[in-house]
A protein has these predicted regions:
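Short, small/polar residue-rich loop motifs at catalytic or cofactor-binding pockets
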Residues: 1-3, 125-126
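Short beta-strand scaffold segments in enzyme catalytic cores
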Residues: 3-12, 130-131, 331
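Zn2+-dependent cytidine deaminase-like catalytic core
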Residues: 8-107, 193, 217, 222-224, ...
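A short, flexible N-terminal coil/short beta segment enriched in small residues
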Residues: 11-18, 107-120, 208-214
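Proteins enriched for Cys/Gly/acidic motifs involved in redox and nucleic-acid/cofactor modification
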Residues: 24-25, 89, 103-131
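Generic secondary-structure signature for well-ordered alpha-helical cores
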Residues: 38, 94-97, 101, 116-120, ...
């Protein structure tokens, strides 16, 4: 579901606040109007996305706005959901309520980028996260990577895990580190689905991702051992065959995750998986956590894919954001190539 907030203003004062906190629960408008009570009459309502006009898991927000007799509704954006798109605005206007659209629209699009991609493509929004040295290495020549970045950057990564529905790594990461792939924060966190790409099912049955604390999904190929797949299913994992092989068909894998209503994926795999996802055009945003360290030319590179012959054809990042995180830096951007994303 999208991130939606609502503010009710009457005579220049905020009289109601609300947010959509959980799927199936009342929408932001309902919470805000309940808080405002009778003061909603004649008020202006500011909301992130246009109010819904259809019956879903909750009643239409337009009905509640009409009951409250608000005078004006200001929305950041039209909802891209085909069930909603334009219908909510039209219904409010037909009822005589003034509707203004487009206020802070770019900010809304950035906040709800994952929702917008999923609702229009049924494919998850993929964020690639990498911790690396200034010379682009994710580990030393021996494979040691504990720790590339400092504690503040590592905590920021746990926040990212909390904000994504799934974490995805390659089997090499599981074999090398046996990670838990959980969000560990000082406060209760949402735990993502744990996803591993493993074309031949080399993942150990004793791996911590099969501890049953959160769901695990293994993406594999037709070349994998069926008996091993059955054993993983007995451990509670979901095994999805994504193509004939020899490698996992990553685009098909993303479609399969989308079919399971996974709208966002945090990609934390090594250089091979990161490179393959970038080359396939499946990464929507890159977050690079740079540590002020140098690992040398024999360190393990962050991106394992053949580069272009010309610099003009290199993958570049747009919409750049740079943040100081403890003693490290986070560079975030949207990957694009010449001629399109």
């Amino acid at each position: 579901n999208p991130a939606v907030g609502c503010v009710v203003v009457k005579d220049g004062r905020i009289v109601g606040l609300g947010a959509h906190l959980k799927r199936g629960e009342p929408h932001a408008e309902v919470h805000a109007l309940n808080m405002a009570g009778e003061r909603s009459e004649g008020a202006t309502v500011y909301v992130t996305l246009e109010p819904c006009a259809h019956h879903g898991k909750t009643p239409p927000c337009c009905d509640r706005l009409l009951e409250a007799k608000v005078a004006r509704v200001v929305v950041a954006s039209v909802d891209p959901n085909p069930l909603v798109s334009g219908k909510g605005i039209a219904r409010l206007r037909e009822a005589g309520i003034e509707v203004v659209s487009g206020l802070l629209e770019e900010e809304e699009r950035r906040i709800n980028a994952a929702y917008r991609k999923y609702i229009t493509t049924r494919m998850p929004y993929v964020t690639l996260k990498i911790a690396l040295t200034l010379d682009g290495r994710i580990a030393t020549r021996t494979g040691d990577s504990r720790w590339v970045t400092g504690p503040e950057a590592r905590e920021a990564v746990h926040v990212l895990r909390h904000r994504h529905q799934a974490i995805m790594v390659g089997v090499s990461t599981v074999l090398a580190d046996d990670p838990e792939l959980t969000a560990r924060l000082p406060v209760p966190a949402m735990q993502p689905v744990r996803v591993v790409a493993d074309s031949r099912l080399r993942v150990p049955e004793t791996a911590r991702i099969f501890d049953g604390k959160t769901p695990a999904v293994v993406l594999t190929t037709e070349q994998a051992d069926p008996a091993k797949a059955d054993r993983l299913r007995e451990l509670g994992a979901e095994v999805l065959v994504c193509g004939p092989g020899p490698r996992v068909d990553l685009r098909l894998a993303m479609r399969r995750l989308g079919e399971r209503e996974i709208a966002s994926v945090l990609l934390e795999g090594g250089g091979q998986l990161a490179g393959a996802m970038l080359k396939a055009g499946l990464v929507d945003r890159v977050k690079l956590f740079y540590a002020p360290k140098l690992a040398g030319e024999d360190g393990i590179p962050a991106f394992a894919f053949a580069g272009p012959e010309r610099m003009a054809d290199a993958l570049r990042l747009e919409q750049i954001e740079i943040e100081h995180v403890g003693g490290d830096w986070c560079v975030s951007g949207v990957p694009v190539r010449e001629g399109g994303t």
